[in-house]
């Protein structure tokens, strides 16, 4: 009897883990101002940037030099150069990824991501659709309360003096 109860319980658990709420929500691809073929993106981007920007990958924590960057300037999408974050809104979240408390309005788009079995808000470049990272509600309370947790490889930094880093 214990074995039968265990099998029923396990079966119920496995079926519930495969419910529609656990599946990645498929939304139609948006049309973006900058569009390229997969081959063009591969030729333009490093393998790491291609994985993150075009396949919604995640770089390893603490692997990006931009995480510790303290210079004044603008962070742009590594795919198309659209300005997405300003350095004056960057903060050290301790997570190992560059973090900001706000975006440059109109240049970042948001969607729902359920890939890990729970809902997260995903951030994309509004110009090319490149995956940037995710936004969470555990940022600095004295500002927006948001933490835009961004893959450094999805960004390029333009210092105030205009030279690309």
How should each PLM-predicted stretch be described?
Residues 1-25:
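Bacterial Sec-dependent N-terminal signal peptides
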Residues 7, 30-32, 39-40, 87-90:
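Alpha-helical interaction segments
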Residues 18-39:
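Sec-dependent signal peptide cleavage junction
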Residues 25-32, 71-79:
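Short charge-dense sequence patches
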Residues 42-76, 82-165:
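A short Gly-Trp-Pro
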């Amino acid at each position: 009897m214990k074995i039968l109860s265990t099998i029923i319980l396990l079966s119920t658990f496995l079926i519930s883990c495969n419910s529609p709420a656990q599946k990645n929500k498929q939304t139609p691809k948006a049309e973006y101002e900058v569009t390229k073929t997969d081959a063009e993106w591969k030729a333009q981007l490093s393998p790491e940037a291609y994985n993150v920007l075009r396949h919604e990958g995640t770089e390893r924590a603490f692997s990006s030099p931009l995480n510790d960057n303290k210079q004044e300037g603008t962070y742009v999408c590594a795919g198309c150069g659209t300005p997405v974050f300003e350095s004056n809104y960057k903060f050290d979240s301790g997570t190992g990824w560059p973090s900001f408390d706000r975006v440059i309005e109109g240049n970042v788009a948001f969607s729902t991501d359920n890939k890990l079995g729970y809902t997260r808000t995903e951030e994309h470049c509004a110009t090319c659709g490149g995956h940037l990272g995710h936004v969470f509600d555990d940022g600095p309370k004295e500002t927006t309360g948001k933490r835009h947790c961004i893959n450094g490889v999805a960004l390029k930094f333009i210092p105030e003096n205009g030279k690309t880093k």
